Amino acid sequence: MDEKPAVSESSNGSDVDSLSTASAYEQHRERLRDANPQGVTSHRSGVNVKEAEEEFSELNRQFSTISHQAHCLSKQISRASKPTGKTEDVERSDSPADSDEPWDLETALRGNRDAETAAGIRSKRIGVIWDNLTVRGMGGVKTYIKTFPDAIIDFFNVPETIMHMLGYGKKGKEFEILRNFRGVLQPGEMVLVLGRPGSGCTTFLKTITNQRFGYTSIDGDVLYGIFDADTFAKRFRGEAVYNQEDDVHQPTLTVKQTLGFALDTKTPGKRPLGVSKAEFREKVINMLLKMFNIEHTANTVIGNQFIRGVSGGERRRVSIAEMMITSATVLAWDNSTRGLDASTALDFAKSLRIMTNIYKTTTFVSLYQASENIYKQFDKVLVIDSGRQVFFGPASEARSYFESLGFKERPRQTTPDYLTGCTDPFEREFKEGRSEDDVPSTPDSLVEAFNRSSYSERLAQEMDAYRKKLEQEKHVYEDFEIANQEAKRKFTPKSSVYSIPFHLQIWALMQRQFLIKWQDRFAQTVSWITSTGVAIILGTVWLRLPKTSAGAFTRGGLLFISLLFNGFQAFSELVSTMMGRSIVNKHRQFTFYRPSALWIAQILVDTTFAIARILVFSIIVYFMCGLVLDAGAFFTFILIIVLGYLCMTCFFRVIGCMSPDFDYAMKFASVVITLFVLTSGYLIQWSSEQEWLRWLYYINPFGLGFAALMVNEFKDLTMTCTADSLVPSGPGYDDMASRVCTLAGGEPGSVIIPGASYLAKTFSYFPGDLWRNFGIMVALTVGFLTLNLYHGETLQFGAGGRTVTFYQKENKERRALNGALMEKRTNRESKDQSAANLKITSKSVFTWEDVCYDVPVPSGTRRLLQSVYGYVQPGKLTALMGASGAGKTTLLDVLASRKNIGVISGNILVDGAPPPGSFLRTVSYAEQLDIHEPMQTVREALRFSADLRQPYETPQSEKYEYVEGIIQLLELEDLADAIIGTPETGLSVEERKRVTIGVELAAKPELLLFLDEPTSGLDSQSAFNIIRFLRKLAAAGQAILCTIHQPNSALFENFDRLLLLQRGGECVYFGDIGEDSHVLLDYFRRNGADCPPDANPAEWMLDAIGAGQTRRIGDRDWGEIWRTSSEFEQVKREIIQIKAQRAEEVRQSGGSQIIVREYATPLWHQIKVVCKRTNIVFWRSRNYGFTRLFNHVVIALVTGLAFLNLDDSRASLQYRIFVIFNVTVLPAIILQQVEPRFEFSRLVFFRESACKSYSQFAFALSMVIAELPYSILCAVCFFLPLYYIPGFQAAPSRAGYQFLMVLITELFSVTLGQMISALTPNSFIASQINPPIVIIFSLFCGVAIPRPQMPGFWRAWLYQLDPFTRLISGMVTTELHGRTVSCSPSEFNRFQAPENQTCGEYMLPFFERGGLGYLADNTTQACEYCAYKIGDEFYSAFSMSFNTRWRDLGIFLAFIGSNLIILFLAVSFMSPRCRLRYKLIYDIF
């Protein structure tokens, strides 16, 4: 196989480092110049591209001993890339100037290829041709947001609901995403795909790599060599791969482990001579780490939002490296340079160029921001406008083509910006004398122009020539097929698209799964602590169970809870299965492994971890509780618990595979779990179940497992009847012949109860059920696993096509506002439109002097900022620039008072005085992350900011008018009523960025506007729009400080001043930029660095100071040059002058005009506005409310039907308690929904509270109030079926009390979830705390173990502190008080009265002494005794009283009050700083 190592870029700045001496380098370069007079090289590039092909033949002669060379190269790379294990960001590593031995990518790649050729590995080359390609998808239309009532209405549309649950059904209107694309890309060629966001670039890349899922139809022809798309997908799926824009990885694996796993599945069967699998693996990993300059992260975990790991830029590089390991022949890279600095992005592009040249791959690349040097790496360019192909041809001729159409280019505009700009009606300009009338200006007209051009004719000729070439070069495709087979390892079927056989996939995945589980220390620690803690609690509660009638029922309760707890430990598999879909889908298209292999590997590894945890749990429970001391019974106990866990694990994974989203999964799981618990045989015995429920026993892991555990425990157990259980009992009743034990299975005249008899009479369980149930459980586990494997292989969920933007329906007010905005859009075409109509004023001047910032590190302290000086004036736009990791965001945070750890020194002043108490309120800070409440519309988000952050004295009408101006300024007219949504389903990245800026502008900052990377992740046109907006604001008088990452010339010329930082937080320049950057460039020129005339000053100055991977210009440190310069002294003088001048102006005007108060509005107004927003959000979050309501109704309905029309029998007394006990499941279903909702709202609150929008109290109160309507509705819908279907007492006094208890339980659960979420840093940790809390509440409330039987330690305090103690006591006594009991024939205890006595005469002393129950007939000698006469006698054994029910209700209400108090305190004091401390604790594990 033509195996290509996973490589992409050089990590150093030299051009040809493979040559040992400078003279050899010059001689070699001279030879190449003669052979390639038109070769293209890049200024200060880390990778030389055009020389690659010329050097190839030269290097072939140099590598004479292939095997020896391969070994040496491996050792060389291994030495050069030994991982350091540091966790610092790559951008903070030393610059290339300080690096050791240089490393050359070209030499390594050519050496690898040469070694492969010598080993007889055939070359893989395949081109792609597409013709009349049309792709259709769903969405892209104006869809109105659905609300909570809509969810209820849609649910009763049963057929459509079922279709949606299965992932089918209507998803919107079909539309064309791409239309009539045609082109050809031959092996060894690269094409750059350009287009505005939403134009179809991603769809084209997916389609061209055969990623067709999610699109409704794909028409036209796509050929991969001689293979059509279907054949190619079937036989060579892994040869066409797509690198998505998002980075999806296992967060607990290290970088090296992530790449190592990819190589475990992709290491070829045929390798260079003498290179073993282990050597090949290590060699490629080290090469990748070296190429991407991430050697220091080799042993650092990838991480995610919960786990601290590598930086975003490093994670992006790991994604790139992972796909390169696939060794595919057709590669598509979708905006893969996002998050990379310009130097790394350029090296990535050059690495693709080298790999494409040497390995003859076919490479498609889409980039949002591409420099001219990046553009030069490509052979062809494809330009897309609104799904239409408006140009495809040579990259070197594309610019001239669009110029010939009449489009004007701006000075210093890069070719990619120019080409994309020609498709943007607001950015393109026409040549003098030309206009839209004679220049193609619509997608259709541009297509027509291209079709009439010579480029279209040349393309047709090239496509025809390529088709003919396919017939002539059949040997190439024979080599391709042979190489594809040679890449497969031994035992891999020839028809398989995978590189390794199924058993090796399982083995590789088992190794990975073990690392995932082992390295997720926090989850493992919490799991073990929870399991061990619950085991100890169970052991102490049921400590040394007696082998008497008193321990029979509690022994069953212990077995049931043990099985249930460990079974529900598997619930996390549902979440992890759904969250892991994106990783599985990515690896599926990379052909790393079959999804079925993953599920098998997971179950094998998880079994190992589960056995260890369950073994400890079982040992504690089994021996502390004194279960049967028999080795066989003990190991059978463990076996059943483990099997129950595995069965539920497979079950939850099946749900995760089958469900299209988490809401559907939760709905389905709630129904099935409720049925499993109800039919388990503990709450209601099998013989007493409704006929329609009994069959569930045979597919119920809990029912089968519980029966097996009971048989295992009781089959050989002999119990003794206690005196309390003997009837009659007391003085005078000594003759056992006339007494009977009330425990089921007892025989008259005997105090011995065989366990088998007890099981048969009570549960209808028999000794033979044990291994029969074990076999059924094994079959269920295998069945669930089979379903898991099947659905994992056949089902795939995800989005294809464009995402849908939802809108709020227009009313009269919004219709009028939108009409006014549309009328003003005509001003949009005026490029010099000002923002003066917004009346932005900012007179104060912000200065900082000698600012230093030190943070604590394990070794002491680390200085991130060092003596930084500067100022920002009204009407000036100041850029803050520097390399990644130089401290730009840190400086912004320090200046904006957003840092809450470390030590800040220096002077930060407003008008020469310390910032006032209202500073945070008067400064707007647009953070890099666009965090918004997703269910708000754009207009609502801006109005919310204006309502709370502009002075309360400003009339609301004036605030809202100002908001309309902001909408117009930010060109958001079409999106004013659009729901912001999430990046996956909502506004695009660029649109969200504009909303972020709009929210800050709507606050009308009195002092300063900070912006952190406002152009990050945007395409060039969007970035230009953002900077143009800022330019308008500055012209209107706003003071702005903005960090920006590698702007092009057009962006850079909009700034007035520059603050430039180098690594270490040192300033290297602060001052004016000047027209055409002449002031800035003059400073550098005078200090030894001369900018070439054709270079972008913004990029060049960063290279000059060594910000990228190139060496700095000059020997002196640029920070030192600045500190000794006259410009620095001038800045200090200007700051002193500005402070004095502004202080005098403030004094003369009678003081600062800024109102000094913490919040702009009073508390009552904050509560009003925040509550309104929160209620709207809940109303629109239809799945949140409806899923909760659905779970309530289903659980209540199923429970009610299971206990349908309970009679007055003795068993029904217990069943009524179990029905009431089901109310305690409410916290379990409420906490898992409330906590994530609260956490996300808190994340938004942290962002909004940082600028003092509203108080913590207003936030917490609004969350509580917003939950009230849904809590009341859920309580009503839960109460009605649960209460009336079983036939509970219908008297208003009883039913009303019971409803109050259900409602209080609902409110208690909601406030409990909010309290837990407020006390924990994230919902994951909260979810780990929930199970023990719910278990403790349910265990100590008096049902699972009655109060008299509870150990004194727990009874003395925890029983009283358990909120559910009051719930159970109040509801049980209210239901059973005064209820007459009528035993069924099977429930009577039968015994013979002594001779010459009737039953009534014999039992009279017993009843006179307060004995419970009654006799069926007092006149006979054959006595039939019922243990209870009225319900009061039943619950008296639980130490409950009807007289205390209102006290219980009051105490239960008090628990809600305590939740609220803790919630408000936690929200007030749990700042992001406190959450950071929790985060550090989390990271320790």
Swiss-Prot record:
Cellular component, GO annotation? plasma membrane
Query: Looking at the keywords, is Plastid present?
Result: no
Q: Which Pfam families match?
A: ABC2_membrane, ABC2_membrane_7, ABC_tran, ABC_trans_N, PDR_CDR
Where does this one sit in the cell? Cell membrane
One GO MF annotation is: ABC-type transporter activity
What residues bind ATP, as annotated?
A: 882-889
InterPro entries given in the database record:
AAA+_ATPase (IPR003593), ABC2_TM (IPR013525), ABC_trans_N (IPR029481), ABC_transporter-like_ATP-bd (IPR003439), ABC_transporter-like_CS (IPR017871), ABCG_dom (IPR043926), ABCG_PDR_1 (IPR034001), ABCG_PDR_2 (IPR034003)
Please provide the record's keywords in A-Z order.
Answer: ATP-binding, Cell membrane, Glycoprotein, Membrane, Nucleotide-binding, Repeat, Transmembrane, Transmembrane helix, Transport
Q: What induces it?
A: Expression is highly induced in a single triazole-resistant isolate (DI16-8).
Regions that span the bilayer: 522-542, 556-576, 600-620, 623-643, 664-684, 691-711, 774-794, 1184-1204, 1211-1231, 1268-1288, 1299-1319, 1325-1345, 1449-1469
What is the regulation of this protein's activity?
The efflux inhibitor FK506 does not impair the transport activity.
- Top-rank taxon of the source lineage equals Eukaryota
Q: Which residues are glycosylated?
A: 12, 132, 335, 451, 1396, 1418
Which segments carry the region annotation Disordered?
Answer: 1-57, 75-111
Q: Where is the composition biased (Basic and acidic residues)?
A: 85-95
- Which family does the UniProt entry place this protein in? Belongs to the ABC transporter superfamily. ABCG family. PDR (TC 3.A.1.205) subfamily.
> What does this chain do?
ABC efflux transporter that confers resistance to fluconazole (FLC) but shows no resistance to other azoles. Is also able to transport rhodamine 6G (R-6G), a known substrate for many ABC transporters.
What protein name does the entry list?
A: ABC multidrug transporter I
This chain is encoded by the gene named abcI
